[in-house]
Amino acid sequence: MNDFLITKVLNNNVIICTKAQAEYVLIAKGIGFNKKSGMILQENQTIEKIYILDQKSQQDHYKTLMELANDTLIQAVIEAVNIITNSEMKVDNQKLVISLTDHIIFAYKRLKQNQLINNPFIVETKQLYSKEYKIAEKVIERLNHVLEVHFPEDEIGFIALHIASNTESLSMREMDLINELINKSVFILENDLKQTIDKDTIQYQRFIRHIQFLIKRLRNGESLKKTNAFEALLKEQYPLCFNIALKIMRLLQQELKIKVYEAEVIYLTLHVYHFMENHKS
């Protein structure tokens, strides 16, 4: 670290340095305190964790974000990132520090202006990404403490999705699409079965996980082994369940623009059947 030359101190937590004629943005709690341009960053300086941005596009975006936030907010964001990177989750530190800084700065500004955004996927996020959700709870707890605010539970879900999108190599847009397709599938279920699905049940957790992994299989071009005899049996004995499963499959095929293999209908029919039977009992 001792060969980093400080060229600019953005704030107490962010500095711009050069090393071997290349520019870097260094981010860490208190890294800029009492620092000035022209100083060398000492290797033995006690710093909890440093995040280094070496790509110009990332640096430019991060510098722009720094103009929108004060030291306290940036420190809170860094502490939030530290909570995630110190957890068992394997994340891309550079990608995470950029996306989370962007999200938290604007979430904080919306909160101060009382412009809250409802999270329609809070239940699904909590079910699908339980580990990420628990970490997000700690993040929000820390943000609330440092910033002296109270983020709503919806924000826990948003943070959890940021963590999950980083660990699963999916963009936020792709994760939103998966949640949207799950919601549309549940709507088809409730509408055709004429019942309200209890989202706190194990059956619901299994269903949304099935849809989640089904979408992943489709995107990866994977298919399940087809059993014609079993398919014919389900179609004959449980026509309503089979048709609901078929309708959901057509939805996925249309939205994802990917071929859905017939074998998938069999396994989805079984899930629909369990919902129908549990409702009867």
From Swiss-Prot:
Coiled coil: none annotated. Keywords: Repeat. It comes from the Bacteria. Signal peptide: none annotated. Gene3D superfamilies: 1.20.58.1950, 1.20.890.100, CAT RNA-binding domain (2.30.24.10), PRD domain (1.10.1790.10). GO terms for biological process: positive regulation of DNA-templated transcription. Belongs to the transcriptional antiterminator BglG family. GlcT subfamily. This is Protein GlcT. It comes from Staphylococcus saprophyticus subsp. saprophyticus (strain ATCC 15305 / DSM 20229 / NCIMB 8711 / NCTC 7292 / S-41).
